[in-house]
Amino acid sequence: MKPKDKKILKPHRPARLKNTRLLDLEVLDELPDNIKFKAKRTPEKVAETYKKDMQLISGRILEIKSNYQYTIEANNKTFTATLSGRLKQFAFHSKSIVAVGDYVELDIVAEPPRIENILPRKNTLTRYLGSNFQRPTILAANIDQVIVTSSWRKPMIKPGLIDRYLCLAALDNIDAIIIINKVDLCEDREKLEETVSYYKNVGYTLLYTSALTGEGIDELYELLKNRDSVFSGQSGTGKSSIINRLEPSLNLPTAEVSDYNEKGKHTTTSTILIPWSFGGHLLDTPGIKTVHLAKDTKSQIPRIFPGFATLAPLCYFNDCTHTHEEHCAVLSALEEGKIPTNRYLSYVSLLNSL
């Protein structure tokens, strides 16, 4: 039987183009020199593209509501606005697309008014979740200073929480002021000053205040005038009471601290930007029990922890962690009693948490 012939494979030839003709190159010479050919736009160009019928004005976000609704101050008026469709695409992937304190461009022709552009931020105050998959939450944007509010009692003072707030502000290059409220409940002023004098010694502004008696309110008033300040701190420390003392017309809600566990209750449920009558703005934030920093900031903590900024450059190793290295200026200061032991232990605890 004759073996079956193998099929001979022929090289594939592309199909011929039909009904096509090449562009006459001489036609290109006849086109005007200023003709513009449409090309793919970069994201930057897309972000700067506005409709012709827009009327844009600059404003600032006072409050973030639900469902893409925002309260905005612009031209001495208050608007309730929404995000443009373009910005909503970014907001779907990031909660930090807009923050209280942001400067924006608002289209007042649209109904309702629409945020078309978010202007560059000077700074942000950002905190992170404590899980391994951290997601940033911007508490406020474009601020001048953070007022770290603590209390001597009800709830008890937590210097470790103050340390974390100060590091949070330092990471974002924001000035920090510490106020110890409810000093009217303190029966031993020497013990109070011994507990917190370290912060004053290393350069922080420290105030003792009482919303009940008015102690320290005048000094705080001068520090807040014509500046944008964010009040942050543990729940129940009296932030709202201090604000009401400074600006009685606000009449912010307050709550009593539990006598059983000396823990405060949340009276501020969202961040809001409020203009002071004496110039500047107030950013009141909800109280939180603890502050988590970004895990990728661990290498910066040895240089920004309260009191370490002037000592870290004196260490022999540039990447000194101040835990075991030889010729460490921080460890030497600890041995000499210049750094309190409890502050150093707070530093180690913060470092190990990252």
Predicted region positions:
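Conserved Switch II/interswitch segment of TRAFAC-class P-loop GTPases
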Residues: 109-111, 116-126, 143-161, 184-188
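SH3/SH3-like beta-barrel fold
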Residues: 70-74, 81, 106, 115
